[in-house]
């Protein structure tokens, strides 16, 4: 099988398609660890880690698409198609950093061992990681 030069990547939630386009590489954190996908990668179905950042390198004029992702799956096919199917996701440029900081502080105050609160903290931290990387670009 000939290796294509680009991946087709789509990032979707139950509510909408956040982004779709071509990229050179996808980097995502799964429950098993971080994974990098390039054209020609073997098929994969992976569970995304809560509060993680998905990066699509070689996309857009800026060269990168970043999104905060909380839960979901990543599917990679033989045809170099990568689907990020997230329960909750936001593109970095959509994240209000001050609001995300406030959400993190609130979640940290309330997170005294409750699994739902720990998930809120992870989601807030992921949003800030994605947004901060966007600010630096």
UniProtKB/Swiss-Prot annotation:
One cellular component term from this protein's GO annotations in UniProt: proton-transporting ATP synthase complex
Q: How does it sit in the membrane?
A: Peripheral membrane protein
Quote the InterPro entries the UniProt record gives: ATP_synth_F1_dsu/esu (IPR001469), ATP_synth_F1_dsu/esu_N (IPR020546), ATPsynth_dsu/esu_N (IPR036771)
Keywords, comma-separated and alphabetical = ATP synthesis, Cell membrane, CF(1), Hydrogen ion transport, Ion transport, Membrane, Transport
Report the subcellular localization: Cell membrane
Q: Which GO terms describe its molecular function?
A: ATP binding; proton-transporting ATP synthase activity, rotational mechanism
Instruction: Please give the family membership noted in the entry.
Output: Belongs to the ATPase epsilon chain family.
Function, as annotated: Produces ATP from ADP in the presence of a proton gradient across the membrane.
**Assembly and partners?**
F-type ATPases have 2 components, CF(1) - the catalytic core - and CF(0) - the membrane proton channel. CF(1) has five subunits: alpha(3), beta(3), gamma(1), delta(1), epsilon(1). CF(0) has three main subunits: a, b and c.
Q: What is this protein called?
A: ATP synthase epsilon chain
- Native species of this protein? Thermobifida fusca (strain YX)
């Amino acid at each position: 099988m000939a290796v294509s030069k680009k991946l087709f990547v789509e990032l979707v939630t139950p509510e909408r398609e956040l982004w779709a386009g071509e990229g050179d590489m996808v980097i995502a954190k799964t429950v098993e660890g971080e994974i990098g996908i390039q054209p020609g990668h073997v098929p994969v179905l992976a569970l995304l880690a809560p509060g993680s950042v998905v990066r699509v390198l070689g996309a857009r004029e800026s060269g990168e698409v970043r999104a905060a992702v909380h839960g979901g799956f990543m599917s990679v096919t033989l045809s170099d198609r990568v689907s990020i199917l997230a329960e909750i996701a936001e593109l970095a440029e959509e994240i209000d950093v001050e609001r995300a900081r406030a959400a993190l502080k609130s979640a940290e105050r309330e997170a005294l061992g409750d699994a739902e609160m720990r998930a809120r903290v992870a989601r807030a931290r992921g949003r800030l990681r994605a947004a901060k990387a966007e600010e630096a670009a």
